[in-house]
Amino acid sequence: MNSTLIDSLLARRRAVSPWAGLYFLQSLLINLALGYPFSLLYTAAFTCLLLLLWRYLPRGQKALLGICSLVAACYFPFGQAYGAPNFNTLLALHSTNMEESSEILTIFPWYSYLTGLFIFALGIIALRRRKEEEQHRMAQLSGIKDSWTVTAVKPRYHIYVVVIGESARRDAMGAFGGHWDNTPFASHVNGDFFMDYIAASGSTQKSLGLTLNRVVDNKPQYQDNFVTLANRAGFQTWWFSNQGQIGEYDTAIASIAKRADEAHFLKNGDFEADKNTRDDALLSMTAQVLATERTQPQLIVLHLMGSHPQACDRTQGKYATFVQSKETSCYLYTMTQTDDLLRQLYTQLRHSGDSFSLVYFSDHGLAFKERGKAVQYLAHDDKFQQNFQVPFMVLSSDSKAHRIIKARRSANDFLSFFSQWTGISAKEIKNRYRFISEQKAGPVYITNFKLQKVDYNHLGSDIFSLK
């Protein structure tokens, strides 16, 4: 994040937020709706609570505000007539029948119901805060000009494809040493397979932020990413995504996608929206691109949902081999689904008639929870090596053999790989070693959830059980 963005964010924080005023008004109305007398202290205290929760636990704040707004909206007419809830009002509510209830509802003035609707409407507005703020954040991230200085452009292939997987552990894939034959395509296709590639961090936003962007003082410069580098080099760029485009965990990465010449998302909201969208729906988009002959070098990016928890949502509950729990079994089957997508994409590229090279890697791995139990599942973590052990493979139109590369590689060096792979040289990228080789690259550090650099070798182990 560069100084311009930091300054703008600080300016926003210094400014008086209209949301603080809305929270104050809603807190006041909730207090009055429940029949309590006006209290500046209680109103201010609840406003501060909402602001604190928004900063540290936004989903909890939304739940609290939603429940309080709904209860206040419903109780407002009663509160004005009978006062604050107490034992007698609760007893009366419990003992009343339908006829008595309908009679009570008719005695309240119409404006009491109108006020209740107003309270409910304010609650809805408050619950929509994230989307509006994320749209503003997206505009900020997407609007900053890149600072790449391209010094040479010598692409070896006409089409370059980057497939970004999601939550795939390397040891869950047969092609990378996993115990299950669940990746028939990757296990046999010619290409370069990296058996010791380490992700930058343990969650999508943190990991891809450090992988896809130039990093200065441990801070991703979102304007200087691999897409803007390709744009500067004269490539035509495409981004097709099955991830979210607006949301707490999506906006920063989606802002990279927005830098492409063409960007299309299967989901309208965050990553949890439209859960039934499938990764293979992206193939119709790549087919359209490949159907037209183009003179410019092409960069096509596919961002998958892959193996994101819950895995059974990805597979519609389907799995091939039962391992410990249904969720674990579904997780293994997501690897087969991704493998088949890569097979279909590879076939499309072959049929295009153009030279091509495809790289696939996952953003991060997962760790086991409730290990050994019938409810065992996998989730995000940052304490184990397996959280960072992910697949990385390069398949090219001129690959002659299925080659295994054992040298350790770090996602922190992805831009160096991208530069060497595409033939795009830039003053800001220093190539310390040849990425596709057995050349040693030095120690690898990951970034944990506290944004601390940790030596990968010092992490614990979370092996995949065979049961």
Predicted regions, residues:
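A solvent-exposed, charged loop/short amphipathic helix patch at secondary-structure junctions
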Residues: 315-332
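Polyampholytic, low-complexity intrinsically disordered segments
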Residues: 333-336, 453
